[in-house]
């Protein structure tokens, strides 16, 4: 029996328990780590074609990486709520027991849901955020990603689709110059690159098929009394259309993208090009001289991409990707990049499987006309928490073989790697790996939760 003297304490404890349940902290994240060796000796090597923006990742990741997310719904009244989300990332070379590293503070934002009565279902947000990212998992390639500090409103229900509006920022070192400052130490400063993003998603096109359309505008935002270097890329556009088809207990995504000028460098919705590095050939000495100045990214980029993950029965799952990307720049520093790959999975039991990943990359230099190509094959035996190709955590043993033939590379000037390309027989020191092959083997864990 609870006496009156004990009643206030019991009420306080009960209120505390209920509050703790209502305000529970969400813990999410991602991590991978392992150990590997190379056939020719030494630690594990990873293989990526020169000029390609990504690599086939199964049995081909040489670092320990983790993202730790803590979040909490801090207030809720009816269907209205505020949610606070954070994310800190770490990456080390997995070479020692003690590897110190500075964390990357990747997310810190607040999301308010259903706060605007005349826009039910919408969310307003502000802060650093991973914003509606689109990627190909098997090559770890983000083709639409404007993440960064920003603000916006998303999931506005229009009846036929959902509209999202956002603005984010990505800082670019250097690029803004002034000649009016009396302080020589303030003669240049970093350039703030702004992105304005509009997306319309959930457009029903056919049974189990939806379309998403997006427009991104990026620009270099200079401070008063500063100006961009002459000829620097000041702004650009990116247009995206993505069709998602639900099929075979999975999906297929077909994507078409077009970008101009400052949006061509990364090709994912973040502007670059107001600053960079290049080189000059000295008159009379034919020597390479490193010059710290802008890089002009004026031009265009086309990308056609198809990727997906499907089930082919009780025992088989499959991931796949095929992509062509053409970066056609006015200064001839672009590339043509072809990539195609598959990752079938055979399930021996609900928790044990064998995976085979085969990937091929071909990259043509716009400047030299030469091509780099690489194919990579990985066989892995895996134990995972479930019978899906997406099931994690997973522990895998792997063996990887890569064969490449590279005819060009980016010019190296000491410790600097420049955007200019040169053929292997040009006489310049380049990043080209030549014609060779290698194999590696090891063990890795991967988890997300």
Swiss-Prot record:
Site (Greasy slide, important in sugar transport): 30, 65, 98, 251, 390, 448
A Pfam entry, by short name: LamB
Reactions that this protein is recorded to catalyse: beta-maltose(in) = beta-maltose(out)
Site annotation Important in sugar transport: residues: 142
Membrane topology term: Multi-pass membrane protein
Highest taxon of the lineage: Bacteria
Record localization: Cell outer membrane
GO MF entries: maltodextrin transmembrane transporter activity; maltose transporting porin activity
Keywords: Cell outer membrane, Ion transport, Membrane, Porin, Signal, Sugar transport, Transmembrane, Transmembrane beta strand, Transport
The keyword Signal appears for this protein: yes
InterPro entries cross-referenced by the UniProt entry: G_neg_Bact_CarbUptk_Porin, Maltoporin, Porin_LamB, Porin_LamB_sf
GO-annotated biological processes: monoatomic ion transport
A GO cellular component entry from the record: cell outer membrane
Cleavable signal peptide: 1-24
Inducers of expression: By maltose.
Subunit structure: Homotrimer formed of three 18-stranded antiparallel beta-barrels, containing three independent channels.
Family, per entry: Belongs to the porin LamB (TC 1.B.3) family.
Function summary: Involved in the transport of maltose and maltodextrins.
Name of the featured protein: Maltoporin
Native source species: Citrobacter koseri (strain ATCC BAA-895 / CDC 4225-83 / SGSC4696)
């Amino acid at each position: 029996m609870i006496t009156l003297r004990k009643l206030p304490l019991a009420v306080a404890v009960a209120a505390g328990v209920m509050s703790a349940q209502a305000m529970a902290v969400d813990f999410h994240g991602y991590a991978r780590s392992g150990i590997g060796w190379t056939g020719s000796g030494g630690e594990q090597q990873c293989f990526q074609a020169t000029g390609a923006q990504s690599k086939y990742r199964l049995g081909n990741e040489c670092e320990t990486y983790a993202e730790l997310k803590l979040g909490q719904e801090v207030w809720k009244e009816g269907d209205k709520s505020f949610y606070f989300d954070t994310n800190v990332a770490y990456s080390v070379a997995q070479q020692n027991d003690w590897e110190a590293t500075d964390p990357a503070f990747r997310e810190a934002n607040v999301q308010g849901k259903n706060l605007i009565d005349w826009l039910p279902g919408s969310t307003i947000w502000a802060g650093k955020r991973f914003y509606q990212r689109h990627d190909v998992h098997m090559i770890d390639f983000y083709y639409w990603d404007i993440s960064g500090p920003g603000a916006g409103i998303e999931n506005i229900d229009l009846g036929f689709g959902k509209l999202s509006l956002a603005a984010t920022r990505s800082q670019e070192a250097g690029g803004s110059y002034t000649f009016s400052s009396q302080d020589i130490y303030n003669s240049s400063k970093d350039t703030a690159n702004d992105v304005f993003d509009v997306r319309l998603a959930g457009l029903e096109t056919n049974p189990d098929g939806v379309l998403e359309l997006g427009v991104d505008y990026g620009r270099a935002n200079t401070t008063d009394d500063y100006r961009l270097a002459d000829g620097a890329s000041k702004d650009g556009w990116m247009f995206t259309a993505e069709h998602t088809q639900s099929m075979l207990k999975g999906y297929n995504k077909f994507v078409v993208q077009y970008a101009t000028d400052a949006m061509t460098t990364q090709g994912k919705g973040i502007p670059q090009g107001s600053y960079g590095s290049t080189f000059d050939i000295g008159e009379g000495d034919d020597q390479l001289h490193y010059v710290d100045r802008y890089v002009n990214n004026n031009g265009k980029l086309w990308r056609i991409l198809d990727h997906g993950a499907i089930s082919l029965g009780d025992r088989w799952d499959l991931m796949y990707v095929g992509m062509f990307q053409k970066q056609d720049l006015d200064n001839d520093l672009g590339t043509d990049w072809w990539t195609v790959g598959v990752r079938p999975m055979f399930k021996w039991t609900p928790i044990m499987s064998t995976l085979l990943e085969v990937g091929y990359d071909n990259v043509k230099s716009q400047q030299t006309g030469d091509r780099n190509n690489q194919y990579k094959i990985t066989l892995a035996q895996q134990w995972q928490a479930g019978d899906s190709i997406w099931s994690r955590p997973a522990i895998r043993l792997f063996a990887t073989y890569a064969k490449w033939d590279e005819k060009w590379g980016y010019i190296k000037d000491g410790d600097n790697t420049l955007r200019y390309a040169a053929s292997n027989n040009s006489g310049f020191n380049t990043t080209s790996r030549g014609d060779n092959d290698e194999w590696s083997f090891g063990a890795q864990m991967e988890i997300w939760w």
